[in-house]
Regions:
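Insoluble glucan recognition modules
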Residues: 1-171
């Protein structure tokens, strides 16, 4: 229909009636015009461009517009909380958090776990898989700048008959 998600639009509709008997006339109802608000099933996202992207298999460094730039997703519709895992394969990963796949609004370091649209690069301690959590408006008041973030280093391993070390400790 070409309508924008979460924005009210106008739809015109009519019903077409037919039968299996080709000799019967096709009938159409009157056209009805009414407002609708479409929704999307796609979760809101935040992108994580940085100096680690190319070395980690995500495309170009510092390129939020790159379709391979990693992103994290909202935990549910209407939430300002986002989470996801990002692999960073450089000794000193630096990055920003963008609201879209561009640099128009990019969160940087606002000091101890806080985000600021005018802040410098965010960083983590070294290479690895990080569980990144962001809340763009934890107090629910868009008039306050209280956006926050955290990154937790994670360690993953698989064991079982399908792995080279079988059921033994993977370390």
């Amino acid at each position: 229909l070409g309508l924008t998600p979460f924005t009210e639009g106008i739809v015109a509709m009519r019903v077409k009636g037919t039968t299996a008997d080709a000799s019967m006339e096709t009938l159409f109802s009157d056209i009805l015009v009414f407002p609708v608000t479409p929704y999307t099933t796609e979760s809101p996202k935040l992108w994580i461009p940085g100096n680690y992207a190319a070395a980690s298999g995500y495309g170009a460094d510092w390129a939020p517009q790159d379709p391979l730039t990693p992103y994290i997703e909202a935990v549910e519709f209407g939430s300002t909380a986002y989470e996801g895992f990002v692999y960073m394969n450089v000794p000193s990963p630096n990055f920003k958090i963008t609201l879209e796949q561009d640099w128009d609004e990019a969160y940087g370091d606002g000091g101890t776990g806080m985000l600021d649209l005018a802040g410098g690069d965010l960083s983590v301690t070294g290479p690895g898989y990080y569980y990144i959590q962001v809340d763009t408006d934890p107090d629910g008041d868009p008039g306050t700048n209280d956006a926050s973030w955290s990154a937790t280093a994670t360690s993953w391993a698989l064991i079982g008959a399908a792995t080279p070390n079988s059921w033994n400790d993977p370390d």
